[in-house]
A protein has these predicted regions:
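Class I S-adenosyl-L-methionine
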Residues: 1-207
Length: 207
């Protein structure tokens, strides 16, 4: 890693890409454009419990919302996402999420939100917002990853939502090999037979 890529401050390399919500006229929840997830005009889950759910994503500002101990603090893939719309986090975002989730869940049979393309859960109150929304809308689901410590205040809040909603809140703790529901970097931990597996996308075995 180059010297310029280490010890980055707690904000994105692309501050002009952070969208101030008072000036932002677009929705904060975006339909997924990731061809690995869906190539359809309306991106939907193809198999499993959430088959038919429409896929949405939320992108926050990397590092500004992330724990400093994140293994990928310096080499976050957001470093290569110059044009991503990073949504300003805070109370206005949470207000917008409430309104947009209500509209989407009233429109589609099911909605599943990827948290977060960039960024992380930034407060206990923010985690509890998703807990509230999952309780209110039974056709809502969430999946994603967090760099928060399993035992931190935010980590404990995330665990509480997982415990309450199971697969509807499929958030994995990153680089926490002692946690059953975790996602671990291959350069840190080798998969153990019977305990872990490599994502099929990484081995070319996905459909």
């Amino acid at each position: 890693m180059k010297k310029a890529q280490t010890n980055k401050p707690a904000f994105t390399m692309y501050p002009k890409s952070v969208k101030i919500l008072g000036e932002y006229k677009h929705n904060v929840l975006k339909q997924s454009k990731n061809a690995k997830l869906s190539k359809d005009r309306l991106p939907v889950v193809k198999k499993g419990q959430f088959k038919g759910y429409v896929i949405y994503t939320l992108t926050l500002e990397e590092r500004a919302t992330c724990p400093r101990e994140c293994y990928h603090w310096d080499d976050c893939y957001g470093n290569n996402m110059m044009f991503a719309h990073r949504i300003q986090h805070g109370p206005e975002l949470e207000k917008r999420i409430k309104a947009e989730v209500a509209e989407l869940c009233g429109t589609y049979r099911g909605v599943i939100v990827r948290l977060h393309v960039l960024g992380d859960f930034y407060s206990v109150d923010y985690v509890e917002l998703w807990q509230y929304l999952l309780a209110k809308f039974d056709n809502l689901a969430v999946w994603g990853f967090t760099g928060r410590s399993y035992s931190s205040d935010i980590g404990l809040a995330i665990r509480a939502v997982i415990g309450g909603f199971g697969a509807r809140f499929s958030v994995r703790f990153s680089n926490a090999p002692d946690v059953a529901f975790s996602a671990n970097s291959a350069d840190l931990y080798q998969p153990e037979k019977g305990k872990s597996l490599i994502c099929p996308e990484q081995t070319g075995k996905s459909e």
